[in-house]
């Protein structure tokens, strides 16, 4: 199911701030965010903070390790320790990661965690570096179960509203899929009994088309997401 949201953008575009605002809306959540660490107004490093409020230094200008990004030395042992605190979750937990970037990707354990989150049935949201890429990141971008959303200073307020709505649509799609009696299939047309009446979806060359207003504006909706997953399960 398309249930993973990746927020990308240039440094200081607001992607981490946006993720932090979104996860505040969820009570049951697992993951971590990365915070700046400053001293006398100067950024000297980054710390990881888990959903439980546990913190550990990820990188610092004064560390001496074999892993370095810009002037920051990365402590892989600290990172792996924090990963062990967020690698287990329940089926209804909301998953989040900030960020999938160069520092974190020094850790093989982090790569395993990313794939575990994305491969789960849980809704997952993560920030993704725009200034760094490697084969692992490019493979993530090619997945067919993600929404890749770019944030800029100009569009972040608009995208915040869109993301909040999209998350509700994904959650609704998951519920629809769990209730197969909602679906009635007739060749290239499908009827879905929704919470607000019946929606008719038609198959076109570019994929499934829905008549709802959200789809007309965004080319995606809970009905299309649900149908794609329903057909995958029942093919």
Predicted regions and their residues:
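P-loop (Walker A) phosphate-binding loop of NTP-binding proteins
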Residues: 10
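Conserved glycine(s) of the Walker
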Residues: 14
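Hydrophobic positions on the alpha1 helix immediately C-terminal to the Walker A/P-loop
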Residues: 18, 22
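N-terminal phosphate/diphosphate-binding loop that engages ATP/GTP or pyrophosphate donors
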Residues: 24-69
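Short, surface-exposed amphipathic charged segments that create phosphate/polyanion-binding patches used
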Residues: 44-50, 160-169
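Helix-adjacent hinge/juxtasegments
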Residues: 54-93
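Long, low-complexity, compositionally biased intrinsically disordered regions
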Residues: 165-235
